[in-house]
Amino acid sequence: MDGEEAPPGALNLADYAPAGARTVDCFRRIRKIGEGTYGEVFEAMDIITGERAALKKIKLDDGKEGFPRQILREIKLLKKLDHENIIRLKEIVVSPGTAHGAGGSDDYMYRGDIYMVFEYMDHDLKKVLHHSTPSQVKYYMEQLLKGLHYCHVNNVLHRDIKGANLLISGGGKLLKLADFGLARPFTRDGSFTNHVITLWYRPPELLLGATNYAEAVDIWSVGCIFAEFLLRKPLFPGRTEQEQLSKIFELCGFPNEENWPGVSKLPLYKTIRPTTPTKRRLRDIFHNFDSHAVDLIDRMLILNPTERISAHDALCAAYFITKM
């Protein structure tokens, strides 16, 4: 990805799975619970402690392409982040016989499989997203924003907030932000890929080609999740990027230099055409819901990213202060 690669030598797997690391034989696999770009995820049990865990298997291509840089970045970020609403990476384990290459620190010389060991969570938010009570919605949204605020104050963008990446445990009482595969550290003057965030939760600035962006991209995704909680269906279920923009503009209005200074300079702005109606009418579809909840959604889904509410300010909003 343009502007996304870590400099050579900046990340070494040996820093996280040193020689002598435990092997996956220390776990008993129970069942497969998922599959991603780089491998499978299993529910497992630590045969020593009896604790359940989630094993994310990272398949290496016989050393031909080395250890995926995206996974190395995810490991590094998760080792840095420590918050009750962020999934905890407990350790890295290896397949039996896995060995370092010459020198013992070159991640490109690893052989076999590497496993990321996470704390086990019962299920993801998708299972409750369309049938949660108002009090549950508030509880989940508060935890999501707390985890996200912690990421942002530590200069980390998640860049893939969606129901499948929000995990629930503790009898439905604990939410944790997970899957940091697209996450990355950020600076205000950085340039990043805009091919991130699942389409339904992707903000307009990325759809218009922006490469200089910050925390507001995650806030848009949170706003989409919040709206989906209330409506019990996705807010912007586009099938293509163009259709996604059209659905956003239908509810949030058409962007121009008046409501979003600088928008006309974005690479894909000239390719879009005004939709009808162009007036913002987002609040109209939430007229039967709690006014404080609607106010917060409205502030999360502002077209101009510089005007979107921050995670910190969202946590201070009237929605979280008022009793149900």
UniProtKB/Swiss-Prot annotation:
EC category name: transferase
Phosphotyrosine PTM sites in chain numbering: Y38
Occurrences of domain Protein kinase (ranges): 27-320
Sites where the protein binds ATP: I33, G34, E35, G36, T37, Y38, G39, E40, V41, K56
Gene: CDKC-1
Protein name per the record: Cyclin-dependent kinase C-3
Catalytic activity: L-seryl-[protein] + ATP = O-phospho-L-seryl-[protein] + ADP + H(+); L-threonyl-[protein] + ATP = O-phospho-L-threonyl-[protein] + ADP + H(+); [DNA-directed RNA polymerase] + ATP = phospho-[DNA-directed RNA polymerase] + ADP + H(+)
GO biological process: positive regulation of transcription elongation by RNA polymerase II
CDD domains: STKc_CDK9_like (cd07840)
GO cellular component: cyclin-dependent protein kinase holoenzyme complex; nucleus
Catalytic residues, chain numbering: D160
Keywords: ATP-binding, Kinase, Nucleotide-binding, Phosphoprotein, Serine/threonine-protein kinase, Transferase
Domain of life: Eukaryota
The EC number(s) this enzyme carries: 2.7.11.22, 2.7.11.23
